[in-house]
Amino acid sequence: MVDAADSKSAGHWSWGFKSPGSHPEAVMNTYNRFPLTLVRGRGCWVWDDQGRRHLDAVAGIATDTLGHSDRALRRSLGRQLRRLQHVSNLYRIPEQDALATWLVQHSCADSVFFCNSGAEANEAAIKLARKHGHLKRGIDRPRILTASASFHGRTLAAVSATGQPRYHQGFEPMVEGFDYFPYNDIHAFESLLERHEANGPAVAAVLLEPLQGEGGVHPGDAGFFQRLRHLCSERNILLILDEVQVGMGRSGRLWGYEQLGIEPDAFTLAKGLGGGHAIGALLVNAKADVFEPGDHASTFGGNPFACTAGLTVAQEIQRRGLLRNVEERGQQLQQGIQGLVARYPQLLQGVRGWGLLQGLVLHQDCGVTAPQLAKAAIEQRLLLVAAGATVLRMVPPLVISANEVRQLLRRLDATLAELV
């Protein structure tokens, strides 16, 4: 099922775009790419180099908060480029101050460190946790507890924190000091904590996602997180949340921790913060703020351009009432997927998620994997992304309309019908 509009070009764009002298093999082979070249976007839609229009439920993997080529971002970033693009953090940066102020005014944090990505934000959090362990708990070799099936990034400490052995293979030895327990399992956590601390303080921090995205779209359990918060507070262990994927409104709340009824000591952001532009952040409360000048730094982090993008996204979320849209469209999407689960019980097991981060769960023995389903959906001009072998993730821009959700569901229905 492909709309006629999907085959029409728009405006005066040259659909035969090709970079002069370009050689795809010049790009290092680190991605399993789909056979699709995207050259233009507007809102929730992207066009390929053949002029075909696709509904984008990937959004740069939960990154294009306001959709593609957003007017507010175009205007603010155009002005910023004409004024000042980058200066060193050796000097005060007004745009950085403005974004940090907005973030602390709208969260439980008291201060912000800016960087360029989620992995960098988590690396900063890991350094913060270790220093806290040394200074506040007197630990010589601090440990950090994270969850099985978690995902915290590809840099070495971040991937060591990631509780998925497949990401470790070939890159050993991992950074020491990380231990894993089953997500949402408070008894397993308490057992691991007691084992480590039987002879005194040993754990500096717990690092968790409020909702595990890459690991299969598993929402956090509020009861688990509330008990965890209590245990961490009792021992002065930092509770750090990786909000890289759910932060900035994707869950239907501004922050994922609001879904859980807790406040962390620190949390990390990236992805949706810049609306498609590279920015990451570590946000901390006063208790956790142990960094001093020279402890950590970033050349590009907090530059005027990136912070203008972040502040524009934040202000547009407020101005357009996007949290309400996420909640309403998320309910519409989840209910629609439930209907598809009932229609294709031989393929589909269920759906789980928050807001506009929904995971369609396939039966393990259905003969189709999530990556295969994502590839098949391209034929219906629908872009989706897998979260493991059996979960198909839908993370469209937060501006998606009710009609676009209906189109997403129709295209997904048509894809499934072809596979039965």
Swiss-Prot record:
The modification N6-(pyridoxal phosphate)lysine is found at K271. Its EC number is 2.6.1.11. It comes from the Bacteria. The keyword Oxidoreductase does not apply. InterPro entries: AcOrn/SuccOrn_fam, Aminotrans_3, Aminotrans_3_PPA_site, Class-III_PLP-dep_AT, PyrdxlP-dep_Trfase, PyrdxlP-dep_Trfase_major, PyrdxlP-dep_Trfase_small. Pfam families: Aminotran_3. Pyridoxal 5'-phosphate binds at G118, A119, F151, D242, E243, V244, Q245, T299. The keyword Transferase applies. CDD domains: OAT_like. Its cofactor is pyridoxal 5'-phosphate. It is an enzyme of class 2 (transferase). It catalyses: N(2)-acetyl-L-ornithine + 2-oxoglutarate = N-acetyl-L-glutamate 5-semialdehyde + L-glutamate. Pathway: Amino-acid biosynthesis; L-arginine biosynthesis; N(2)-acetyl-L-ornithine from L-glutamate: step 4/4. Keywords: Amino-acid biosynthesis, Aminotransferase, Arginine biosynthesis, Cytoplasm, Pyridoxal phosphate, Transferase. GO terms for biological process: L-arginine biosynthetic process. Its main location: cytoplasm. N(2)-acetyl-L-ornithine binds at R154, S298. May also have succinyldiaminopimelate aminotransferase activity, thus carrying out the corresponding step in lysine biosynthesis. Belongs to the class-III pyridoxal-phosphate-dependent aminotransferase family. ArgD subfamily. Homodimer. This is Acetylornithine aminotransferase. It comes from Parasynechococcus marenigrum (strain WH8102).
